[in-house]
Regions:
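Amphipathic alpha-helical interaction surfaces in cytosolic regulatory modules
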Residues: 22-93
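Short acidic-hydrophobic, aromatic-tinged amphipathic segments that line or gate anion-handling sites
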Residues: 95-97
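STAS-typified acidic loop motif
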Residues: 2-28, 50
Length: 97
């Protein structure tokens, strides 16, 4: 799993590459913490192959912790990853670009 942070300020992008499984979730959580202060977190999932339920929980917890004004946008999901968000209903909570 590779996570690359792009940008600073109000909108920060995390580019995700590989499999975001349970073992990668702590690194994902740390990367998200590194975006504190941003009003919008964009997750570039164009090279993401898999996302685990623990990573989904991390996203929900982050949204809840940072409040209603904080936005999480999902970008470039493949069919497999998109289906996870559709089935869980999280595509209704996060902005899909």
């Amino acid at each position: 799993m590779e996570i690359t942070k792009i940008g600073n300020g109000n909108e920060v992008t995390l580019k995700l590459k590989g499999c975001l499984d349970t073992t990668a979730t702590p690194d994902f959580a740390a990367a998200i913490e590194g975006t504190a202060g941003a009003a919008t977190l964009v997750l570039d999932m164009s090279e993401l192959e898999f996302i685990s339920s623990s990573a989904l929980r991390q996203l929900v917890a982050t949204k809840k912790k940072r409040g209603a004004e904080f936005k999480i946008a999902l970008l470039g999901m493949n069919e497999v990853v998109r289906e996870v968000f559709d089935v869980t209903g999280l595509d209704e909570i996060f902005e899909v670009r």
